[in-house]
């Protein structure tokens, strides 16, 4: 049992490399210990078990913020949050187990081959984790080394390839421990070559900054947002933070679900239609003459014009006249958050989805680029859609920036900084600036190199006034997507 306990403890330690702790050297050391445990496993089943227990420890700590989301919905007992974290971790641990098993099966006879196969397997299993069963791409280990120069591998091999680089670094630590100096040197040279190639693949420096923008963070907690009677205070906070006296054209950015009443609906009732039009005018009155607003909101849908049968979680483009110029509908919905799987069964048990309301959201068509007046081409990723590497941009119509409105008020102290780190990696690998607006933090301006230019702290009301950072030319990853990390994994083996 000792190896399994060591594997579990190593998994716990590995999670400390992510935000808000950021002890990435400890993450690499923990992965080195996992590799040693795989190396000494007496058989395939033992290697699989050690990888699985490592994964359980890793995900239980790294995903602890999920439990917080269950405290805001009366129909979902808060205690279910901890159970959800454990059950999700038990499932996600299958992927580290698979990587460990493949490394043992194909690499156990040679230490250098062991780490190469492990790194390749880790790339593939993280990619699979992001896609199977709706996908959950949170915290690939490449995020842990975002603060290091090795993150420049991302424009070439993407986030999953960067995770492979992190696995190679852990393997180098093991080789040094085993005094395999030549093998360690060869692996280190390979890692350096990938990072250098990624840096060169980034292309020329971005051009000058673009139009003015303001990001609004109203500091509205989840416990207040849907509280009865709070709608007027919600709009007043947005008004106070949005108003300005300038005459220059400006892009104004509000968070996900900033407007809590529907900006569009499919109901025929004149009262609902009038209420919707009045709401649009109320929003338009907050804008300057040349402002353009991007705001999160909802659309009601009705099959018969009388009752709401579904909804969309959307970003609306609104001008000073109160016109909705365009809309992006979130495509990658959160199961149990934005829709309830097996609704007839689970609702009969008294359960509901985490987001308020008793109808499910419909998914949109996917990544989409909208051409905004004066501003130019914009891409949209709502909330956790930004975590899916290779899926955030319409490659046939590349935008000049990505807007990532989110409601991270659900996710306690650990979720927001982890979410921000993953948004930074999307900027780096795609060569596009990312703008984030959230109700409680962390709102931010990220340049095309993944650098955090400006941000607002968690649980703070305020604005960010700046200019739109320029994009880089398309990176290799922006052109080819996740073909590149998969090719990288083939090269490793």
Regions found by a protein language model. Give the residues of each.
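Generic alpha-helical structural signal
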Residues: 10, 100, 232-239, 281, ...
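Short, conserved active-site loops that position catalytic residues or coordinate cofactors/metal ions
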Residues: 18-33, 58-65, 217-219, 249-266, ...
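Membrane-interface segments at or immediately adjacent to transmembrane helices
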Residues: 144-150, 191-285, 290
């Amino acid at each position: 049992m000792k190896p399994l306990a060591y594997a579990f403890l190593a998994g716990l330690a590995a999670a400390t490399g992510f935000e808000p702790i950021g002890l990435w050297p400890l993450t690499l050391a923990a992965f080195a210990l996992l590799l040693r445990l795989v190396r000494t496993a007496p058989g395939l089943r033992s290697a699989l078990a050690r990888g699985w227990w490592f994964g359980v420890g890793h995900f239980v700590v790294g995903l602890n913020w999920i439990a917080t989301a269950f405290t805001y919905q009366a129909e979902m007992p808060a205690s279910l949050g901890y159970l959800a974290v454990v059950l999700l971790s038990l499932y996600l641990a299958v992927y580290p187990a698979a990587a460990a098993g493949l490394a043992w099966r194909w690499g156990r006879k040679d230490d250098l081959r062991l780490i190469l196969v492990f790194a390749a397997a880790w790339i593939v299993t993280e990619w699979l984790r992001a896609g199977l069963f709706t996908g959950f791409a949170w915290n690939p280990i490449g995020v842990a080394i975002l603060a290091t120069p090795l993150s420049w591998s991302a424009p070439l091999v993407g986030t999953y390839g960067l995770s492979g680089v992190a696995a190679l670094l852990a393997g180098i630590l093991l080789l040094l421990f085993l005094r395999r100096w030549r093998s360690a040197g060869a692996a280190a040279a390979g890692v350096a070559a990938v990072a250098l190639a990624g840096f060169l693949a980034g292309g020329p420096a971005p051009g000058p900054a673009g139009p003015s923008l303001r990001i609004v963070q109203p500091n509205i907690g989840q416990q207040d947002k849907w509280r009865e009677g709070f709608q007027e205070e919600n709009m007043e906070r947005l008004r106070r933070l949005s108003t300005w006296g300038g005459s220059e054209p400006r892009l104004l950015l509000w968070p996900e679900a900033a407007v809590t009443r529907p900006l569009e609906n499919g109901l025929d009732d004149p009262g609902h239609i009038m209420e919707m039009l009045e709401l649009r005018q109320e929003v338009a009155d907050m804008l300057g003459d040349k402002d353009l607003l991007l705001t999160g909101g909802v659309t009601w849908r009705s099959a018969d014009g009388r009752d709401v049968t579904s909804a969309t979680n959307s970003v609306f483009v609104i001008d000073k006249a109160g016109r909705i110029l365009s809309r992006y509908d979130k495509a990658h919905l959160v199961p149990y958050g934005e829709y309830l799987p097996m609704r007839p069964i689970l609702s009969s048990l008294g359960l509901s989805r985490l987001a308020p309301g008793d109808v499910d959201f419909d998914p949109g068509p996917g990544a989409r680029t909208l051409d905004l007046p004066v501003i130019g081409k914009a891409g949209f990723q709502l909330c956790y859609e930004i975590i899916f590497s290779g899926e955030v941009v319409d490659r046939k119509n590349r935008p000049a920036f990505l807007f990532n409105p989110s409601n991270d008020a659900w996710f306690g102290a650990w979720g927001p900084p982890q979410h921000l780190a993953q948004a930074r990696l999307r900027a780096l690998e795609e060569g596009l600036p990312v703008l984030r607006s959230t109700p409680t933090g962390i709102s931010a301006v990220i340049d095309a190199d993944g650098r955090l230019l400006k941000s607002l702290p968690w649980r703070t009301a305020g604005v960010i006034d700046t200019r739109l950072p320029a994009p880089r030319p398309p990176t290799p990853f922006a052109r080819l997507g996740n073909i590149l990390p998969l090719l990288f994994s083939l090269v490793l083996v």
